[in-house]
Amino acid sequence: MNILLSSTLFVLLMFQIIGSGMGCDMKVRGLDANMKKMILDLHNKKRQIVANGQQSGQPLAANMKELHWDDEIEAIAQRSAETCVFKHTAKSLRKSSKYSYLGENVYKGGYPDPIPRSVNKWYDEVKDVTPAVVKSFSDDGPMIGHYTQMVWANTEALGCGLVTASDGTSYLFCQYGPGGNYPGQQIYKQGPPGSGCKNGKSSKYPGLCN
């Protein structure tokens, strides 16, 4: 075996080791059906609250889509969670067969109940979002990117991965397709809920779009 081939195999092996979460003693790995449903429902309910003008200080949303669960994105997010490192996944690794770029929210905290804690923590950034930022996103100023990715109107797919280490620390990675948070773009179109839907309105979450 030549040196180049040996080096290539070594790099691939190290990538697999890092991606598998070795070095983190995992007590909980992955999400069951109830957990997935909870995460998805929490996201859609938060989006619905904003779209319908029930969030103080936030304008109505005309074109906010209902999110659906994406198994491929879940697998990508799970690999990231299994690194047990509290930092964003490299953008070059955040893509799926359908979406060229996936947004990402990351949470590190105690167990139990990392799901509602994480989603509520991300959403709490709404207090620093102004109507001007909704019209033209900017990441200058207070941290708002977790919230804005949660309610980015064109995002339609969600997948998350979870690891809880033996010390009780949970790592939750949620990825979103297509990703949002593009400077200068609108987070969502302002207007009566559902008035900007291109493929009809959601029957499960009134105010959101299919």
From Swiss-Prot:
Keywords assigned by UniProt, alphabetized: Disulfide bond, Secreted, Signal
Stored Gene3D superfamilies: CAP
UniProt PTM comment: Contains 3 disulfide bonds.
Compartment annotation: Secreted
Highest rank taxon of the organism: Eukaryota
Alphabetical list of PROSITE patterns matching this protein: CRISP_1, CRISP_2
Transmembrane spans: none
Expression by tissue: Expressed by the venom gland.
Cellular compartments per GO CC: extracellular region
Family annotation (SUPFAM superfamilies): PR-1-like
Main subcellular localisation: secreted
Family: Belongs to the CRISP family. Venom allergen 5-like subfamily.
The protein, known as: Scoloptoxin SSD552
Native organism: Scolopendra dehaani
